[in-house]
Amino acid sequence: MNTATNPAAVQFIGENLLPGQLGYIFTIVSVVASLVATFSFAKAFYTNEITQQNSWQRLANIAFIIESVCVFACFGVLFYVISNHLFEYKYAYMHSDKNLPFEYLLSCFWEGQEGSFLLWSFWHCVLGLIIIN
């Protein structure tokens, strides 16, 4: 990316961009897998033929498992960012501190709106995995 046309693209020395890029990729894959799972579960519910119903159900289960893995990975990436005090990320900068003990670092997850939404997604995936198994 050309930094002359996009000044926000400047990369500073020692800046750790990989967690943000991984989180972005996991988020996109999670949303796409969620849409595929929703569509597939609906098709499985409304299909009358057993073989097609089983096929749609299998696709829905696989898509939901992919969504769950991506949500868990996002949770892990955010934990990495917070626990390693990567303050180049706004969420870590706004919701954590170097002096916080571990249990308070863990509670930084749901302090902000984004982390709270991630926590709800996490529990949605846990309960969904219990239900489909």
Give the location of each predicted region.
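Polytopic transmembrane helical bundles with strong interfacial aromatic enrichment
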Residues: 2-133
